[in-house]
Regions:
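Hydrophobic alpha-helical segments of multi-pass membrane transport proteins
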Residues: 319-325, 346-360, 364, 379-413
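Inter-helical loop and helix-membrane interface segments of multi-pass membrane transporters/permeases
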Residues: 2-5, 32-37, 67-91, 104-163, ...
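Select transmembrane alpha-helical segments in multipass membrane proteins
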Residues: 6-17, 42-45, 84-97, 145-150, ...
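A generic transmembrane alpha-helix motif of multi-pass inner-membrane proteins
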Residues: 371, 376-400, 421-451
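Membrane-interface "cap" regions at the ends of multi-pass membrane proteins
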Residues: 1-28, 55-62, 66-79, 83-90, ...
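Transmembrane helix-boundary motif of multi-pass solute transporters/channels
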Residues: 12-49, 236, 247-250, 254-257, ...
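Helix-loop-helix connectors at the membrane interface of multi-pass transporters/channels
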Residues: 74, 107-138, 238-242, 247, ...
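Membrane-embedded translocation segments of transport machinery
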Residues: 2-7, 167, 171-320, 344-345
């Protein structure tokens, strides 16, 4: 078995972990939820949810991963003494692998749109852009080629290991992502009428904070930090023993939230400057925003082209950092459980993800057996992993760390064996035992339409 690596610097560790959390949902979900649910009032609720749910869940996975010093499955197995709790770790590995398969498809779309933006293929009216996306996504070959491309890029990073691959790449990609984001934010906010978008995003309206808004904030705080995918636990495997887990969780959460808010500043001023309600989801990114950029920067087409290229490059970088963390979950599992080299494990994971990606991509075409029950195969992967596996895994992880793992072990990891202040340990344990499981259960039932 290959020698275990670790992160060489605290900055590299934070950027890699934050890169795993920052993804396409920060762009196509959080800004719209914020604008529709009271602006700054929703952001305040969301921050409270991150503190009450996201950070305790992340801390729990940090503790399991660092103490277990193994892949996610083995870490749960070691802490549980090999009993049934180990299957929660196996669920995390499986969830991360399945998500990677269909997430790579959308990530490939981002790469295609970088190419299309640069060569002017997205120039046209709203109907043209909508037709372009429908034609591209249903094509049997082009999306698969781009899916393969982004998986190969990810694989090349993973093959180089933790320090030379994941950490070094994160140190390059995350600052680049942030710079591109700031450039587009400035360009968007300077547009005539852009202030209406900023008002929509930030003006507090507490009358919109109903039960759906609270549950939406809870769900977003859980999903946005990549909880229960195995990513957090696997990266904690590479933490140094002196890493302050609470401080790291706070820093990762802050970066993730900051990027999500900046994404709103990137989207809404441009959309409102041309009178478009941007909406959410993939249609926002691949249909609405190309049209918005075409209209908003019509007077200076070169600027519009650059903004579009930068935007999809930004999305591609966010997708790659997320895919890196998802890939490493399964790669670390195969290395330790099958005693194979990193190169071989990474190749197997890439091949398996590509197979899933091919079928998910083809489900957008007219192949009848890839759509059933009112959903495409892509939608089924999204539904099963996002609305069942993730909340179940998060719920069980909270019960595991809160009740099954010895309190002293949890306290020792939380406080770095007494070298870090433990004044909030009791608060953390209370939340992970009672508040987090209740919140996750509420989100789970709400998503299934129970209430």
């Amino acid at each position: 078995m290959e020698k275990r690596g670790n992160f060489g610097t605290e900055l590299g560790m934070i950027l890699a972990t934050a890169g795993g959390a920052v993804g396409l949902g920060n762009v196509w979900r959080f800004p719209y939820m914020t604008g529709e649910n009271g602006g700054a009032a929703f952001i305040l609720v969301y921050i409270c949810c991150v503190l009450m749910l996201g950070i305790p869940c992340m801390l729990s996975e940090f503790i399991i991963g660092r103490h277990g010093a193994s892949n996610t499955y083995r870490a749960y197995s070691l802490l549980s003494g090999g009993n049934a709790w180990k299957y929660v770790g196996l669920l995390g590995v499986a969830t991360g692998f399945l998500i990677m398969g269909y997430y790579a498809v959308v990530s490939g779309w981002c790469l295609q749109y970088v190419y299309a933006s640069f060569f002017g293929e997205l120039t046209g009216n709203a109907d043209f852009v909508n037709h372009y996306f429908a034609e591209f996504s249903s094509d049997p070959w082009r999306p698969v080629i781009w899916t393969l491309a982004i998986l190969v890029i990810t694989c090349l990073v993973i093959v180089n290991g933790v320090r030379s691959g994941i950490e070094r790449t994160s140190k390059m990609l995350m600052p680049t992502l942030f710079i591109l984001l700031l450039v587009i934010v400035v360009a968007s906010c300077l547009l005539p009428g852009g202030e209406r978008g900023m008002e929509f995003l930030f003006k507090p309206d507490f009358t919109k904070l109903d039960s759906d808004a609270f549950l939406g904030a809870l769900g977003q705080s859980f999903y946005s930090l990549s909880i229960a995918m195995g990513c957090i636990c696997t990266y904690a495997f590479y933490f140094k023993r002196q890493t302050n887990l609470l401080k790291s969780a706070l820093q990762v959460s802050l970066l993730d939230t900051l990027i999500a808010v900046l994404a709103g500043l990137m989207i809404f001023p441009a959309a409102f400057s041309v009178g478009v309600n941007p909406g959410s989801g993939p249609s926002l990114v691949f249909v609405t925003l190309p049209n918005v950029f075409n209209q908003a920067f019509a007077a200076v087409p070169l600027v519009g082209m650059l903004v579009s290229v930068f935007f999809y490059a930004l999305l591609s970088l966010a997708a790659i950092t997320s895919l890196m963390s998802l890939h490493e979950v399964s790669t670390a599992f195969l290395i330790e459980e099958l005693h194979i080299t990193r190169r071989t494990a990474a190749t197997f994971v890439t091949a398996g993800s590509l197979l899933i990606g091919i079928f998910c991509s083809l489900s957008f075409s007219d192949i009848p057996w890839l759509s059933f029950g009112g959903r495409t195969l892509f939608d089924w992967f999204d539904f099963v992993t996002g609305q069942i596996f993730l909340p179940v895994g998060g719920f069980l992880t909270c019960l595991f760390i809160g009740w099954a793992v010895p309190r002293k072990l949890v306290r020792d990891e939380f406080t770095n064996w007494g070298t870090v202040s433990c004044r909030v340990f009791g608060v953390y344990l209370f939340f992970v035992r009672y508040v987090c499981p209740t919140a996750i259960l509420a989100v789970f039932l709400h998503q299934l339409g129970v209430f």
